Amino acid sequence: MTNLRKTHPIMKIINHSFIDLPAPSNISAWWNFGSLLGICLTMQILTGLFLAMHYTADTATAFSSVAHICRDVNYGWLIRNLHANGASMFFMCLFLHIGRGIYYGSYLYKETWNIGVILLLTVMATAFVGYVLPWGQMSFWGATVITNLLSAIPYIGTTLVEWIWGGFSVDKATLTRFFAFHFILPFIITALVLVHLLFLHETGSNNPSGINPDSDKIPFHPYYTIKDALGLMLMLLTLLLLTLFSPDMLSDPDNFSPAKPTQHPPHIKPEWYFLFAYAILRSIPNKLGGVLALLASILILLAMPLLHTSNQRSMMFRPISQTLFWILTANLLILTWIGGQPVEQPYTIIGQVASISYFLLIIVLMPMAGFFENFMLKPKW
């Protein structure tokens, strides 16, 4: 008799996706982050659901409802801190997953990559609207500053901002709709994840060498299920250490004060995972220019397949491209640091240099390195 997992209409799909899936035999720990992101998403949806049971999306009670969750709800403090720090783990895994894709040339699976970029934008939007919900000082002013950026759009900007606000300032209507968006977006993300996996399973996984692995495949289970389980345990350990020992390490102290529309906080800054983009936004003195640079800093990922000039897919055997990749990583860390600093010298000039070099590395230097490596590998006799 044929195994049920191979014949049952639903189990057959699960079997082909997670059990009998042919996977390259040489994929490293850098391929763990996809499954970790799936677990992060599940965890965020579950903790978020329990938080939504006790949260009230009203300017008068939002802040105190979060305090009530932490003080009076059974394990409410744990659920809230897991949700807040879970977002940080989510972005940590996202950035490493994207970095892996760039290093090993996974972006050449264009459909999978493009859905991935859309996923990144959707997750960023979800995190932004979620940060507004506790209705602390940084929530309120962050919402005001970021939504105000849309006013840079010619002709329709101001109307668009007021339409998003639901009035003439960030108020009750804004909070209510942001809660609605924050609730629905994770389910849209889940649907996009399924499309992402659908396209990935059309081609199969890439591998560190970048060479077609069809001649040497192994089943996903038990080899990669056990490997993913190890990655999961390490991630959960990190998350629990963060949540139980220093839950507020990545939070802004200003957000522990209720929103005061009349009192401006000394420095407006987003969560750490948005700081690199915020630094690029601030490095351009012109408002519209800053908004366009902010968009370009993420959307440039869509151009990665077009900017690939090397004859080899992966950077595994390309030392010049490797060097540029790690310079780009360091550059992003500098931008993250600058995003959290006040707008004054020397931070302003460092941010401007880092912003220019970010685009220069991706658009000019990395494609040039690809051409140069191709030339160096040509026989000269």
Curated annotation (Swiss-Prot):
Membrane topology label: Multi-pass membrane protein
One example GO MF annotation: metal ion binding
Cofactor note: Binds 2 heme b groups non-covalently.
Cofactor(s) for this UniProt protein: heme b
Subcellular location: Mitochondrion inner membrane
Family according to the record: Belongs to the cytochrome b family.
Note: Heme 1 (or BL or b562) is low-potential and absorbs at about 562 nm, and heme 2 (or BH or b566) is high-potential and absorbs at about 566 nm.
Descriptive protein name: Cytochrome b
Natural source organism: Trichosurus vulpecula (Brush-tailed possum)
Lineage, opening ranks: Eukaryota, Metazoa, Chordata, Craniata, Vertebrata
Gene: MT-CYB
